[in-house]
């Protein structure tokens, strides 16, 4: 029990050391564990349950827009990977290779997939024939390996779980529309499931995906006011189709190259959730992705009728299609309260002998700590409303953090002072030159996050060169 108690209590305050606070929550809330291979992580049952909820919601969104799931091989022949020069150049430092099959050296090295554009293109080269088969709207849920130098749970690891969507289209216009649709899908998911506001925008040429004509992104602000790229959507034009000889017979009976997209989001979303909502008592989860949405804690459970009453509450809540846990263990109520705060359970329902006499229960919110006494007859409606309130409050607090820490600045010195001080997002004008983008990194210590889709259209000056320009851009220190 003493060991369990330490698990509940030992969290470094975020104000003291944000990075240590984050790692403490990942470990103490039993989301992950470190693997024997450096840079790899074990997703523990509670952490994987969050990922399953993300998958379930997001997969439903994909299917509503006509996407189907497939599974591609984990290994890619080196010759196949090299067909698209920009892609292999972009990922070369991160690729892990298989050189042996059993005790025999392979004739050709095989790459563990860092991403799967090559495998999808190879497949489409073999199966696509006519424009009548288009569009092909594919998605896969899998893990990929990228040999990152610096790793942190959920944010950067050498193996991570994700979904990667890959589509091909008859026209460029259809492919561009797909790219924009999936970006909006990610933004909607973050708002509706994670209670997390994001900035939607386009990456600069320097920051775009290797081989893409355009990359779109959603950028979120964490509690330490750093940026976290939380999902990307790429438009490739017909570049990959040409590299991999993917063709179809068009409406004019001539061979044509389809236009391609890809888009992805990862277990990084769990890290985003932690750093957007959690506090010094542990994990705080929005109800939509919480493995347990309501925990029922009996008070003085050894007394007659208490466990029966708690089980009755559990049954009623489960009938609402909620994820519910009844903790009837021998731990003290105080330990249980701290444990489920650590686990980020949105609502805690308490019932004891006095509550039974009054035909009520006590409901505590994880986000605010507020307690409400609710008549047992009103349980369902109260819980339903409180779960909505938790989501809305989490979103409102995250939105306030984003709005209060986004600054309209005009010089690189102002951006530097912001980055070295409080932190946040700097919104400036930008002339569009790579030189000025690199200078912002060198002088101000920030990277370009995105050019927001909603542009103001006003004229201003580039913070580096002073040229008049109209493009709005966000800068920040990023994970």
Task: Identify the residue ranges that each predicted region occupies.
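NTP/phosphate- and nucleic-acid-binding module
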Residues: 1-479
């Amino acid at each position: 029990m003493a060991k369990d108690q330490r698990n509940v209590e030992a969290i470094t305050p975020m104000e003291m050391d944000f990075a240590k606070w984050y790692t403490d929550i990942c470990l103490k809330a039993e989301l992950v564990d470190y693997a024997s291979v450096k840079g790899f992580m074990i997703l523990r049952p509670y952490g994987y349950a969050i990922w399953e909820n993300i998958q379930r919601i997001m997969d439903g969104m994909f299917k509503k827009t006509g996407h189907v799931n497939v599974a591609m091989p984990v290994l890619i022949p080196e010759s196949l990977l090299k067909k698209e020069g920009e892609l292999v150049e972009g990922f070369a430092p991160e690729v892990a290779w298989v050189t042996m099959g059993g005790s025999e050296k392979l004739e050709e090295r095989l790459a563990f997939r860092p991403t799967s554009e090559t495998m999808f293109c190879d497949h489409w080269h073999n199966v696509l024939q006519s424009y009548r088969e288009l569009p092909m709207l594919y998605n896969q849920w899998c893990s990929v390996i990228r040999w990152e130098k610096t790793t942190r749970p959920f944010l950067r690891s050498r193996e991570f779980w994700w979904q990667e969507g890959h589509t091909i289209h008859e026209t460029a216009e259809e492919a561009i529309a797909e790219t924009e649709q999936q970006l909006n899908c990610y933004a909607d998911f973050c708002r509706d499931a994670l209670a997390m506001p994001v900035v939607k925008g386009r990456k600069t040429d320097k920051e775009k995906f290797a081989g893409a004509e355009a990359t779109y992104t959603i950028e979120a602000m964490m509690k330490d006011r750093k940026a976290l790229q939380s999902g990307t959507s790429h438009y490739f034009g017909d570049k990959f189709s040409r590299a991999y000889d993917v063709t179809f017979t068009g409406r004019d009976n001539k061979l044509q190259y389809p236009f391609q997209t890809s888009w992805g989001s990862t277990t990084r979303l769990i890290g985003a959730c932690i750093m957007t909502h959690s506090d010094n008592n542990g994990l705080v989860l929005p109800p939509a992705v919480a493995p347990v949405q309501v925990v029922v804690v009996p008070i003085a459970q050894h007394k007659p009728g208490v466990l029966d009453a708690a089980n009755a509450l559990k049954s009623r809540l489960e009938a609402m299609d909620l994820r519910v846990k009844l903790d009837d263990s021998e731990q003290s109520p105080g330990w249980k309260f701290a444990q489920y705060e650590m686990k980020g359970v949105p609502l805690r329902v308490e019932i004891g002998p006095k509550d039974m006499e009054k035909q009520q229960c006590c409901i505590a919110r994880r986000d605010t700590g507020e307690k409400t006494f609710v008549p047992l007859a009103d349980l369902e409606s109260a819980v339903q409303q409180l779960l909505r309130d938790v989501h809305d409050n989490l979103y409102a607090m995250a939105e306030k953090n984003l709005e209060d820490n986004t600054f309209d600045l005009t010089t690189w010195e102002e951006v530097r002072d912001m980055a070295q001080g409080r932190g946040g997002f700097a919104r400036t004008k930008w002339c569009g030159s790579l030189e000025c983008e690199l200078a912002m990194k060198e002088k101000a210590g920030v990277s370009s996050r995105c050019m927001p889709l909603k542009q103001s259209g006003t004229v201003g000056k580039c913070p580096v060169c002073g040229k008049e320009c109209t493009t709005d851009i966000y800068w920040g220190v990023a994970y």
